[in-house]
Each structure stands twice: as C-alpha cells, then as structure tokens.
Amino acid sequence: AFTHFKHRMYLDSGLQVVKKEALNLQLGWLNRFGRTAIFVKNDIKLILRNKRSKMTIWVSIGFLFYGLLFFTDSSGGLYNAPVWKIFAGIFVTGGFLFTFGQYVPSWDSSYYPLMMSQNIVYIEYLNAKWAMITIATMASTVLGSFYIIFGWDVYAAILTGAIYNIGVNGHLVLLSGAFIKSPIDLTSTKKPFGDKQAFNAKTLLLILPKLFLPMILYFIGSLYGGEWVGYM
C-alpha cells in the first residue's frame, strides 16, 4: 500500500490537460434557404449538443412504433375501429412535432430576450421552426413505410396523418407555444424538461385538439363516402 501511494502522490498527475474534440457543424448546404437557414442551423445544433433537446430525436423514433399498438392484435381488438388509424397516423409521423414543436419558443428561453433584441423578423423565426417540423414529419413518414406490410389502407392513414401534421398541426403547435410559459433549462439534470414542469394541464389541453380534430374530420368524411373519402 505504501508503494502504491508513493508513486501516485504527485501534484503534476492531477494537472494533466484533458483534450476533447469539439463538435463543429457548418451546415453550409442550408444557406440556400436564406435567412431561415440561420434559425434552422441553430436548432439543429441545439438538438445535437444538449441532452434535453436530443431526447426529442429518441422519443420521435419511439413514436414510429406506436402504430403497432393499433395495427396489430396486441390491443385485443380495442382499437379496431377505422378512426383509430388516423389517431395512429398522427402519432407515428408527429413525434417530433409534439416533443419539439410543442415547446416553441421555450427551447430558446435561455437566450430569447437577447435574440428578440436583435434585428430579427419573428415570422422568419417561426418559419424556421415550421421547416424543422416539416422535415422531421417527412422523415418519419418515410421511416414509417414499413407499415405497408399491414396494408395500403394503413399506410394511407399514416400519409394522411403526415399531411395533416404539416398543414394544420404544424401551425397549431407554433400558435399554442405562445401559451406555454415554462422555460426549458438545457443545462439542468433535475427534470426531463428543466427546472420547471413544462408538461402541465395547459399543455395537455393544447394537445387534445391536435389529436382528436383529425379523427372527427375523418369520421365525418367516412360517413359520406367510406374510409378512403375520410382520408381525403
């Protein structure tokens, strides 16, 4: 034991320089989209560099398999009604929309006052967020193409959910984000979404129209022309 401590009792051993390779993303190919690219690149870097925002990617991947609950017999026939296919389509393609888009502009809460003091057109800021949601929704739609094995009607429901998420829910989440005041601390390790509880009753109430409104529209359409008319 004496020999062990003797060879390790040197101050220099604790002063060694630790080298870490920094993640430097240029993303120059996004410059073709003009000023919107500035915010898109900032969001991509935010997602990849912080544990809080990086979780949105993993949750979105998990949402891709949520449809198995509806399109297989694992639920014991509980969700056999055609209207539940639309519900599944919204979820399968809307993982990123609900986990990231639902909390705009809370993701930027740490530097939001500084950002708003700059010469920034707010519509460009929102367009960038919508572009992120659109790209993620399209990616989820492509990755969810394995649902074709359950039938073309199943994948049609997923495509319908994707179109609705891009055209309607994508705008609704950005609108509802103005009513969510909870900031997200990207550096905190106390809670999944920072020091304050970001998911609350208000958040839940804002989510409900995004889920059940397309189901109601599908039901009305299917009454007049069947399942495929409901998708349209």
Where are these regions (language model features)?
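Short helix-to-coil transition segments within interhelical loops
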Residues: 116-121
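Hydrophobic alpha-helical transmembrane segments of membrane proteins
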Residues: 1-109, 122-232
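A glycine- and small/hydrophobic-rich beta-loop-beta segment
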Residues: 112
